[in-house]
Structures are given as C-alpha cells and as structure tokens.
Amino acid sequence: MIYKTDYHVHSSYSDGRSVPEDYITPAIAAGLSEIGFSEHLTLFKDPEVWNMNPVNISPYISHLETLRNNVKNIKIKIGLEVDFFAGKEEEIYRFLHPLPLDYIIGSVHYLGEKTVDVGPEFYEGKIIDRLFGSYFDSVLAAVASGLFDIIGHCDLIRIYGYKPSADLEPLYRSLAKTMKIHDVAFEVNTNGRNRPLADFYPDRHYLRIFREENVPVCVNSDAHMPLRVAQYFDEAYDLLRYIGFTEMAVFDKRVRKMVPF
C-alpha cells in the first residue's frame, strides 16, 4: 500500500465547510496515512471570511493536538497556508517561528490589493504576460525567503484559463531551480480540477521540469469539504510516476523526509 498524505486541507477554522473531525473518516477511507490541516493565514490584511484571524492560532493548534491524541488510525499533522508578501519576510518569520507546526505552505494569492482567484474580472483589461511575470516573481521570492516547507499551487495565476503569449518554460525552469537551491517542496494541487482551469497545479506540461531539477513533491487536495479529501489522487500519482517521480515528501515538526511511492 502506498504511503499517501494530504497536507493541504481547510476546515471551518478558515474557509472550509466542516470541523476537522469531519475530515478524518473520509481520509482513512481514501487510504491516507497522514492528513494535515493548513488553514489560511493572511498577515498584514484585515481578516476576511476565507482566512483565519491570527488570534485563533492557539485554539486551532490545541484543537488539532487533542484530535491527534484521540485518533489512532491516521496521523494528523498541523500546518498553515501562509500568504507571502515581499518585504514582510522578517515579520512573517517572527510570527511563525514559535509555532509548533509540522509544515508551512507558502502561497501567493495577492497581486497588489486583490487576489488572483477573486474572479475572472481581475484579469480584464490587464496585460496577461505581465501578470504571469509578476506572479512568478512573487512565487520565486516566496521560495527564496526560507519561510516555507512547501509552495502551494505555484501557478494559481492559471485558475481562469488565461494564457500568456510568451513561452512559459523559462519561468517554470527558474522556479524549479530556485526550489531546489532553497530545498523547498512543491505540491501537485488537485483542486485545480474543480476550478475553471479544470486541471492540476502546476501545469502538467511543465511537471517534467521539476523532475529534471529534482524538486521534492507532495500531492495535496486543497480540500475545503470532507468529500474532496484526496480527490483525484490516483490520477495525480499516475501522472507523477509517468514523469519519473518515485518519492514523496512527508513532514514532521518542520523536518522533511522522502518516502517511496
């Protein structure tokens, strides 16, 4: 049996639709060895319905620690999905460093004051090539910051199906090389299949680049409801095997190890 994990799961502590307990049975049924919760944390912005108020960090961690002690058939890992903002690295570090987390996912949602997944209207009237360049620059900065263990949906800018005219291979190559240099993992995020894009992040046409650069990988669902835990995982694992990946990144107390799959 393959050792499978799903580290990108959202509960009602941020924008998920259920309490953490509701995700356990579906995770076990999906054959997961570990499930990790990673609530949205957006510092430097006013709390919104989709992200967790920082004052709730302690209750969130305590809740999951209790759940972990009470559940025996699956390992429960505690994480966060943290928005990256260039120039705020030191403040982010000071906030995160004392927390007893197993991993931290770094994500770029914001370009300016708006998130790239707010709706297709964000892209209207804008130069798509420039947007893609700015987005990848932000992700590169997140990778190089040293703050994160995993980079989440590294090309979320694709969410509504917009495509630049420029060749994207150099952007993906630069991203993969930077991930390898800074020893950061990337995720195959299967939730893109549920968005207008209707495919995984990152773009499957460029996944080979991450393999060629030997970047550690994990498969995550980005589930916001229990029925989407480990969704499309068989397809994702088959795709990774086809490309030549043979190991998966797993995390415990911010330490990564690789397990075969």
Model features per residue range: what roles?
Residues 13, 106-213:
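Domain-core and long-helix interface of multi-subunit machines
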Residues 30-37, 103-108, 146:
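Short coil-to-beta-strand
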Residues 187-189, 217-221, 247-251:
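Conserved active-site loop/cleft motifs that coordinate metal ions or position small ligands
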Residues 81-124:
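Hydrophobic alpha-helical segments and helix pairs
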Residues 31, 100, 147-150, 244:
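Short loop/turn motifs at secondary-structure junctions
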Residues 244-261:
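Extended, intrinsically disordered, low-complexity segments
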Residues 35-37, 104, 151, 186, ...:
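Hydrophobic residues within beta-strands of alpha/beta enzymes
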Residues 1-84, 91, 95-98, 158-170, ...:
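An N-terminally biased module of ancient metal coordination in phosphate/nucleic-acid-related enzymes
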